């Protein structure tokens, strides 16, 4: 009888511990990584948690999660440069499946630190991985998580998202010609009101006011695209309308940085339609024919 009581008491204790972990979204166990998550989520001591994540990484305990969680926490603590160094130094310890997620964190860190050129290169690298069929482990969709909820991301949506980020980065570099080309292709894959506004900004910066006005009315004001009901978006639309004045298009070179679009940018904006079709075929090749044609021209056309 005593053994049964002890057993039931143990079950109640285990059940209580499990419920505690669920409430605080903690992993089970007592490893260095689990202790780091407890300090981060329960004790809310970010600096102590970062030290414990370091210990977990050095102990090879759940390195995939430990490195990513530590980098994100460092970003919150305004230690983004340290987070970049950590990912670059220890990502080789992580699994192949974790590399895509680490790239996403690294892109945000580059953006926060103003390292735009490195952000551009990594975004183009991610696009190239998609073209090669290396993203999503060769599948047309992947499962993502946001605010504790899981959802499916299609390769088209991911490609459009990356192109949008690449267009924004080109805008920060004042390369509005490349940004325009990237945003146009992103809009063909998955139309979005915010990207349409960014495209209008690129056109205005190049003096293409009539075309910008046309896109603004056609793709934002007259269409019910994703994001079109956002009050912040409508405020931005009003700003764009105030910039648009009836005048002839000016020469792009007089208002934009002079830089021909190189082969890497061509690889970004060409062949995406064929690429999307390839994902819908059951037996696609690893590389699209268009990229076989582009590769020999890389040295000749590089910016």
Swiss-Prot record:
Q: Recite the UniProt keywords alphabetically.
A: Coiled coil, Nucleus, Repeat, TPR repeat
Gene Ontology cellular-component annotations: nucleus
**Which GO annotations describe the biological process of this protein?**
cellular response to sulfur starvation; chloroplast organization; regulation of glucosinolate biosynthetic process
Induction description: Induced in response to sulfur deprivation.
According to the record, where are the TPR repeats? 64-97, 100-133, 160-193, 195-226
Keyword set includes Coiled coil: yes
**Cellular location(s):** Nucleus
- UniProt xrefs under InterPro entries: MS5/SDI1 (IPR044961), TPR-like_helical_dom_sf (IPR011990), TPR_rpt (IPR019734)
Q: List the disulfide bonds.
A: none
Entry coiled-coil feature ranges: 62-89, 232-253
Q: Which Pfam families match?
A: TPR_8 (PF13181)
Q: Does the keyword Coiled coil apply?
A: yes
Entry similarity comment: Belongs to the MS5 protein family.
Function, please?
Answer: Involved in the utilization of stored sulfate under sulfur-deficient conditions.
Give the protein's recorded name: Protein SULFUR DEFICIENCY-INDUCED 2
């Amino acid at each position: 009888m005593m053994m049964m009581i002890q057993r039931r008491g143990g079950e109640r204790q285990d059940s209580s511990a499990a419920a505690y972990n669920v409430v605080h979204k903690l992993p089970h166990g007592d490893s260095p990584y689990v202790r780091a998550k407890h300090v981060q989520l329960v004790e809310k001591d970010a600096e102590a948690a970062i030290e414990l994540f370091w210990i977990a990484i050095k102990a090879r305990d759940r390195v995939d999660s430990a490195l990513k969680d530590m980098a994100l926490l460092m970003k919150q603590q305004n230690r983004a440069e340290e987070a970049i160094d950590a990912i670059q130094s220890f990502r080789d310890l992580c699994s192949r499946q974790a590399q895509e997620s680490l790239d996403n964190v690294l892109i945000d860190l580059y953006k926060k630190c103003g390292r735009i050129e490195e952000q551009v290169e990594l975004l183009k690298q991610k696009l190239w991985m998609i073209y090669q069929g290396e993203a999503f482990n060769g599948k047309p969709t992947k499962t993502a998580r946001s605010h504790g909820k899981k959802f499916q991301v299609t390769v088209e949506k991911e490609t459009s998202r990356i192109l949008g980020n690449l267009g924004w980065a080109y805008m920060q570099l004042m390369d509005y010609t490349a940004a325009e080309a990237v945003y146009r292709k992103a809009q063909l894959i998955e139309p979005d009101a915010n990207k349409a506004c960014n495209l209008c900004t690129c056109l205005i910066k190049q003096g293409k006011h009539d075309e910008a006005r046309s896109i603004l009315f056609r793709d934002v004001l007259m269409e019910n695209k994703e994001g079109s009901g956002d009050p912040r978006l409508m405020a931005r639309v009003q700003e764009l309308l105030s910039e648009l004045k009836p005048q002839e298009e000016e020469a792009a070179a007089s208002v934009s940085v002079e830089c021909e679009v190189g082969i890497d940018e061509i690889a970004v904006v060409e062949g995406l339609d064929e690429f999307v079709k390839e994902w819908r075929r059951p037996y696609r090749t690893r590389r699209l024919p268009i990229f076989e044609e582009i590769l020999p021209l890389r040295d000749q056309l590089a910016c």
